[in-house]
Amino acid sequence: MGQKVNPHGLRVGVIKDWDSRWFATDKKEFGNLLLEDHNIRKFLKKRLYSAGVAKIEIERSANKIKMDLHVAKPGVVIGRAGAGIEALKAELEKMTKKTIIVNIVEVRSTDKNAQLVAENIALAIERRVAFRRAMKQAIQRAMKSGAKGIKVSASGRLGGAEMARTEGYSEGNVPLQTLRADIDYGFAEADTTYGKIGIKVWICNGEVLPTRDGVNPREESRKSDRRDNKRDNRRNDRRGNDRRGNDNRGNYRGQRPQGGSRPQRTENKGN
């Protein structure tokens, strides 16, 4: 049975970049650094849950770790006079034994970020809001914010049912197999009294053309539009000719031949 691949991983190297950027000398070091990245992300998601963490980017050098935290509420992370971010850096340095550099990046439109939308839906379900209402409200807010399309899926014991199931809603266009489509994906879990409910969100923010040397993406899109228009015109012309030809073939029967006289009918009369 076919399954859906992670949209971000499918587009890495095409229109998206890696969330972790570093090199390892051998397999053992690679495993240690990968586990350390996982622990850092797990710690930050739990520590800064109220700030709305959308994405964590990690870069490494010799003994330094640079982190870019994309959050919805930067003030919660920074704290009064920068006290919050200094305490956060101290905790991370104690955990990793390395120098930590933290950059805070504000997420402008939270309704178009798939991870934040999924977490908001999960939080609403934990507050006993009907899951259908929470999903539909999130879809409406995303479309009003300018998203090209959105798809939401909820799995688990929805509404406290005995048997788990999956329900989803979608609006607009979400082309998962189009690599140039900017698809944002988010996942969150809602902890309820009758078990966990998984929330998946796909948001399409339009198409992104890969930049190439000497090619302007806008010019390339205009050229492709002109080519598509010419192709459609040629296709319509062919269809029109075929349609006219079919009409002529259908109306040929019963018509009088052009340019000649009607043949005379002869009758044989007996003497």
Swiss-Prot record:
One of its GO terms (biological process) is translation. It comes from the Bacteria. Residues 40-108 form the KH type-2 domain. Residues 210-271 are annotated as: Disordered. Residues 215-247 have a biased composition (Basic and acidic residues). One of its GO terms (molecular function) is structural constituent of ribosome. GO terms for cellular component: cytosolic small ribosomal subunit. The keyword rRNA-binding applies. The keyword RNA-binding applies. InterPro entries: KH_dom (IPR004087), KH_dom-like_a/b (IPR015946), KH_dom_type_2 (IPR004044), KH_sf_prok-type (IPR009019), Ribosomal_S3_C_sf (IPR036419), Ribosomal_uS3_bac-typ (IPR005704), Ribosomal_uS3_C (IPR001351), Ribosomal_uS3_CS (IPR018280). CDD domains: KH-II_30S_S3 (cd02412). SMART domains: KH. Keywords: Ribonucleoprotein, Ribosomal protein, RNA-binding, rRNA-binding. Belongs to the universal ribosomal protein uS3 family. HAMAP family: Ribosomal_uS3_B. Binds the lower part of the 30S subunit head. Binds mRNA in the 70S ribosome, positioning it for translation. Part of the 30S ribosomal subunit. Forms a tight complex with proteins S10 and S14. This is Small ribosomal subunit protein uS3. It comes from Clostridioides difficile (strain 630). The gene is rpsC.
